[in-house]
């Protein structure tokens, strides 16, 4: 049996794919940088070998799966090609692998990871399901009927897939280092829609998704009355959210989610619509929604003394807004303190004003230095340019986070897609 060697095994897609192959009995190993990345924990729990990058890792008989961050000139990839071994890019391999299952791709500018996690949790209670979530979680299940995956629009990677179903949560301008504008983003989603084989579940409250054309049925969900699946009578409190679902204006059932913010109602609606389409029993859906514990780096909470510390991946103005909204729903009596690390110079430059407006929704704002991507050079932009647009915003350094102790009884939200967790860990050490 071939050994699958992953070049960049700690990637947020690569790690779960390695987990899935391992769970299905394949021989798996990989290489990556030696710095700790949270995605390696699940690999280590399965005793999947992780090696430092070295051409000597490449042995005869291997199949090499290459992460997208690594060019063909990477020493391991060059060695594999020189020895005539199969070298397959992550998305191409996954696109072929999906064809064995009823595949459900979850895509959209925001909400992909949470919706993928929620759908996986619910639908696996109905039928055996394998899943790949962009928080580094993967699970291969023997005799799987469904395969649920997070599919990202960045660099049009999701066009490697021809899924049976697609959930489309929203279309928004992001990844300005690749997409020219919102029309370019829409074009990518429109192309994706034409590759879906059975049906599309799309948010009908999104003006761009309403324009999608497809060769399969498009089922719309949302708060507006025109949607096929509509949430009504939404009740938000500190324990979570309850809402009624109407299917084409006929009452279906009442659902409860232990989650906060309107965006989580929409994520749940997408899952309800897909499961209804696949004739999953409503009691299974209700139980799954109630017992979902969330995904990594999405509103992950811990209590420290009088404070609540939240770790969240929010790195776009829209995401910051809904994360602060969720915190206000759960903790209406507390101050909200945003500790934000912008991710990439291009994104920060493109959305400078929007970042400022979204962060102003917090009571206090602390800004970390911009986290640059490996793909870009630092421009002239500095974190001071964002600070100028937010009255009373302060800069914070990883080596001195003690100022945060001043905010007694507050909710501190550490947000970003870079290494914002370093700041959270540093602050926890101050408190220890």
Curated annotation (Swiss-Prot):
Could you say which enzyme class this protein belongs to?
ligase
A cellular-component GO term for this protein: cytoplasm
Q: Does the keyword Cell division apply?
A: yes
This protein's superkingdom?
Bacteria
Annotated keywords? ATP-binding, Cell cycle, Cell division, Cell shape, Cell wall biogenesis/degradation, Cytoplasm, Ligase, Nucleotide-binding, Peptidoglycan synthesis
**What terms describe the molecular function in GO for this protein?**
ATP binding; UDP-N-acetylmuramate-L-alanine ligase activity
Catalytic activity, reaction form: UDP-N-acetyl-alpha-D-muramate + L-alanine + ATP = UDP-N-acetyl-alpha-D-muramoyl-L-alanine + ADP + phosphate + H(+)
Annotated ATP binding lies at 108-114
What pathway is this protein said to act in by its record?
Cell wall biogenesis; peptidoglycan biosynthesis
**What EC designation does it have?**
6.3.2.8
Q: Where in the cell is it found?
A: Cytoplasm
Could you tell me the Gene Ontology terms of the biological process aspect for this record? cell division; cell wall organization; peptidoglycan biosynthetic process; regulation of cell shape
State whether keyword Cell division applies: yes
Q: Which InterPro entries match?
A: Mur-like_cat_sf, Mur_ligase_C, Mur_ligase_C_dom_sf, Mur_ligase_cen, Mur_ligase_N, MurCDEF_pg_biosynth, UDP-N-AcMur_Ala_ligase_MurC
Q: What does it do?
A: Cell wall formation.
Spell out the NCBIfam families in the cross-references. Answer: murC
> What is the similarity comment for this entry?
Belongs to the MurCDEF family.
Q: What is this protein called?
A: UDP-N-acetylmuramate--L-alanine ligase
Q: Which gene encodes it?
A: murC
């Amino acid at each position: 049996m071939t050994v699958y060697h992953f070049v960049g095994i700690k990637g947020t897609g690569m790690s779960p794919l390695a987990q899935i192959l391992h769970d299905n009995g394949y021989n798996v190993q990989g290489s990556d940088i030696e710095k700790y990345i949270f995605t390696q924990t699940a690999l280590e729990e399965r005793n999947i070998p992780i090696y430092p990058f070295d051409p000597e890792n490449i042995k005869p008989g291997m199949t090499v799966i290459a992460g997208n961050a690594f060019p063909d000139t990477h020493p391991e990839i060059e060695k594999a090609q020189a020895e005539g071994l199969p070298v397959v890019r992550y998305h191409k391999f996954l696109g072929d692998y999906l064809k064995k299952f009823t595949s459900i791709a979850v895509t959209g500018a925001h909400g992909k990871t949470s919706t993928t996690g929620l759908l996986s949790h619910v639908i696996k209670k109905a039928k055996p399901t394998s899943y790949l979530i962009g928080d580094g979680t993967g699970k291969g299940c023997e005799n799987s009927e469904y395969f649920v995956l997070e599919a990202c629009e960045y660099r049009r990677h999701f066009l490697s897939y021809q899924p049976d179903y697609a959930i489309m949560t929203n279309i928004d301008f992001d990844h300005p280092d690749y997409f020219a504008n919102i029309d370019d983003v829409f074009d990518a989603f429109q192309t994706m829609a034409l590759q879906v084989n059975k049906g599309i579940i799309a948010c009908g409250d999104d003006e761009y998704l309403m324009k999608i054309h497809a060769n399969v049925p498009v089922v719309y969900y949302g708060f507006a009355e025109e949607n096929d699946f509509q949430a009504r009578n939404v009740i938000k409190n500190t324990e979570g959210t309850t809402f009624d679902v109407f299917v084409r204006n006929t009452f279906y059932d009442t659902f409860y989610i232990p989650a906060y913010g309107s965006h989580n109602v929409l994520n749940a609606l997408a899952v309800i619509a897909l499961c209804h389409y696949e004739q999953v029993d409503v009691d299974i859906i209700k139980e799954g929604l109630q017992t979902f514990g969330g995904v990594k780096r999405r509103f992950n909470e811990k209590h420290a003394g009088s404070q609540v510390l939240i770790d969240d991946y929010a790195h776009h103005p829209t995401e910051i807004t809904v994360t602060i909204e969720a915190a206000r729903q759960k903790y209406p009596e507390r101050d909200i303190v945003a500790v934000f690390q912008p991710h990439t110079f291009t994104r920060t430059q493109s959305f400078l004003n929007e970042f400022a407006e979204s962060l102003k929704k917090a009571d206090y704002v602390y800004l970390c230095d911009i986290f640059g991507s490996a793909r870009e050079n630092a421009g002239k932009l500095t974190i001071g340019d964002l600070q100028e647009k937010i009255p009373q915003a302060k800069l914070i350094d990883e080596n001195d986070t003690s100022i945060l102790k001043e905010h007694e009884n507050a909710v501190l939200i550490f947000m970003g897609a870079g290494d914002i967790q370093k700041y959270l860990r540093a602050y926890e050490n101050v408190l220890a």
